[in-house]
């Protein structure tokens, strides 16, 4: 079991901890599939809603909050039945806009895993306005059920009434809808090919600035992030922050980054290169490889 889970496991009911510990191996990064979830329900004796609340300390253990020292964990439950954990992340000494919120982390985890719809979000503290707006970008976002400890489950519309969202800007395919943008580049570099694939799946209906980041560590592992825009603009999630959040979930240190690639479309209204370099240089002594593609 990973050291970061030792404290929270000790505080769980024994039937749950006994069932959960074998899952928390070196590869665990917050994903529990529907079959594993069913096993945990059976072995713990908890109802699903009780189990998901009980798992929040495990999600919070994924957090990296060097500034706030405030650990927030979130769980996104997909239509597939799988659950995806996420946690807040801050960049030490850097501006707060680099921060990733727990709900963003969990939802991006689900998105990168191929999930097409989030039905429930479970979080250990009430979602801030930023996260409520981010969740409103999802497929049927207003219907997403929000679960909080010792609170009645409510749809997002309860927390964000009279919401402004994608439909107000005539967007009919919201976040997590399958995106496939035509981007191409002649390259045999596996890392660039991976970045290209993720850029083609990014969500940028407001600027058409399709983009993705891939980070490689010294042992050859790669971690990716896609651009996820928001109708309210500021809650948009940048691909570098998503990639760093992915690394954090996998228990990797940012100093292990040995290579970083940003691919973005030349046809967009903005460029993410400046913001991407700022975040990268805050955590690693690596130069950004920046590739701009003409749309087909």
Swiss-Prot record:
List of residues binding substrate: 88-90
Cofactor binding: number and manner: Binds 1 zinc ion.
Annotated transmembrane regions: none
BP GO terms, sorted: cytidine deamination
Domain CMP/dCMP-type deaminase: 47-167, 186-296
Quaternary structure, from the entry: Homodimer.
Protein name as annotated: Cytidine deaminase
Organism placement in taxonomy: Bacteria, Pseudomonadati, Pseudomonadota, Gammaproteobacteria, Alteromonadales
